[in-house]
Structure formats: C-alpha cells, structure tokens
Amino acid sequence: MKHLILSGCAGRMGRMLESLIEQRDDCRIAAGVDPAPYHSEEFPVYSNWERCPPNADGILDFSSPAGLSPMLEFATGHGIPVVLG
C-alpha cells in the first residue's frame, strides 16, 4: 500500500482526491498539508510543511503556486516523489 501526502487538501481538487483515494485499496492518505483550516477524520492535516512528518511514498500537489516552493523543498529534502496538478 502506498502512503501519500495530499498538498492542498482543503481545496476543491484536494477534497475530490480525498474521496477518490478513500475508495482505493492500494493507497491511502497519510497526511494533508494546507494553510486553510481543514479537518479530516481519515488523516492528520498540517498547516505547513515544517510540521508534516516525511513518512510517505509520494506527494500529490494541488495547492496554490505560493505553496509550491516549500513543498518542493520538503520533497527533495526527504527524497519523496511528487505529482503536480
């Protein structure tokens, strides 16, 4: 099973991806990152990358352009592959 971090989880695409991933058996959301207040029953949500643990197989990014640099710094620093949306 792949563990994913969902960047931009509070946005429209983030919420859609959350609902689609919840239906799958081969992956799960390990954490979400979004500066907007958001609560999920399924995974912890962090307001910034400094708080997010790096225990993931990949990052799905549907955040705003302003969130791209911190996310890429986190991903490259921890060797985590990224899918940009």
Regions of interest found by a model, annotated:
Residues 1-5:
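Extreme N-terminal starter segment of soluble prokaryotic enzymes
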Residues 6-19:
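N-terminal Rossmann NAD(P)H-binding glycine-rich loop of SDR-like oxidoreductase domains
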Residues 12, 38, 65:
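Conserved Rossmann-like nucleotide-cofactor binding loop
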Residues 20-42:
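NAD(P)-binding Rossmann-fold cofactor-contacting core
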Residues 28-29, 41-55:
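Short acidic low-complexity segments
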Residues 52, 56-85:
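Glycine/small-residue-rich loop that forms an oxyanion/phosphate-binding "nest" at active or ligand-binding sites
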